[in-house]
């Protein structure tokens, strides 16, 4: 390859990276997530700490869904950096393993690597950390579909114009999410039939062209549904600690309210296995399903070995 060809390829890649940096998901933009460094098939990103990201105000720990959404978007960046920027991508499945709670007040960083691309599928792994990548907060593996639809987030006109509303958590001292600012930020509410509802808003958009709900927001919603189900069915006051979550994405979340339900699959003395599903206008057509495990927190006067 001539020097001219190398220079042209390098310039084209720089332009692709800049497009990815500036034309991302709506949620990614308003959350403050930024791409710090890039290489072919690799992305390094940072999510600045914000009080609205807290999942349990009693401990100050960030909601697991915030980490899920960050890793989902960071993996998407890596996939786009492995491609030419002309094809739409969509998350097929995402597995998160939570290694330790994020330290309150510190930013979260991520390093995502797209390690293999076939004609239709991209395979990615990622690490979320705070100070050192060798001490992860969470790790992830994911599969993305290539050419998932006919949109191009990097060039097509968004469905909504104007600035989206900022991420804010309205006060609700007597509601089920009194101690979860992030759940309140998403507007999640408990319905009369004990399902949970996440109203559609511009804040939770992933693909702004369709528009479609951010896959990470769907994952956060499913995890929240499972947390509420476990607390309610076991009669515990403290939210359980997430161990792992696997989300399977079945169809795009459209510009509609989303409903979720969860159930306990197995309960041990310390660990609970759960499954959850989310749908929109037809419960028989879920947009995503999830399964995972929680660690129960000791009740006052109890100790876990």
Where are these regions (language model features)?
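Terminal targeting signals and extreme-terminal segments of soluble enzymes
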Residues: 1-305
């Amino acid at each position: 390859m001539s020097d001219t060809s190398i220079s042209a390829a390098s310039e084209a890649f720089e332009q692709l990276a800049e497009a990815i940096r500036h034309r991302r998901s709506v949620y990614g933009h308003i959350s403050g997530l930024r791409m710090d460094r890039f290489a072919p098939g690799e992305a390094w990103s940072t999510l600045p700490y914000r009080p609205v990201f807290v999942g349990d105000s009693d401990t100050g720990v960030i909601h697991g869904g915030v980490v899920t959404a960050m890793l989902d978007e960071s993996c998407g960046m890596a996939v786009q950096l492995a491609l030419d920027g002309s094809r739409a991508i969509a998350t097929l499945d995402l597995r998160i393993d939570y290694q330790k709670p994020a330290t309150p007040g510190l930013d979260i960083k991520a390093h995502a690597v797209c390690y293999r691309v076939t004609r239709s599928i991209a395979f990615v792994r990622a690490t979320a950390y705070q100070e050192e990548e060798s001490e992860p907060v969470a790790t992830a593996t994911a599969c993305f579909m290539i050419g998932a639809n006919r949109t191009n987030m990097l060039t097509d006109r968004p469905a909504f114009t104007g600035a989206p509303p900022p991420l804010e958590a309205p006060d609700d001292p007597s509601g089920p999410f009194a101690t979860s600012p992030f759940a309140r930020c998403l507007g999640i509410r408990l319905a009369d039939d004990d399902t949970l509802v996440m109203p559609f808003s511009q804040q939770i958009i992933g693909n702004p062209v369709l528009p479609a709900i951010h896959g990470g927001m769907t994952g956060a919603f499913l995890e929240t549904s499972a947390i509420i189900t476990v607390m309610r069915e076991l009669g515990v006051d403290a939210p359980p600690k997430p161990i792992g979550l696997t989300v399977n994405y079945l169809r795009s979340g459209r510009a509609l309210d989303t409903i979720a339900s969860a159930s306990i699959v197995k309960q041990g003395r310390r660990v609970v296995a759960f499954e959850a599903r989310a749908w929109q206008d037809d419960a028989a057509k879920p947009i995503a399903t999830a399964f995972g495990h929680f660690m129960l927190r000791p009740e006052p006067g109890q100790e876990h070995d």
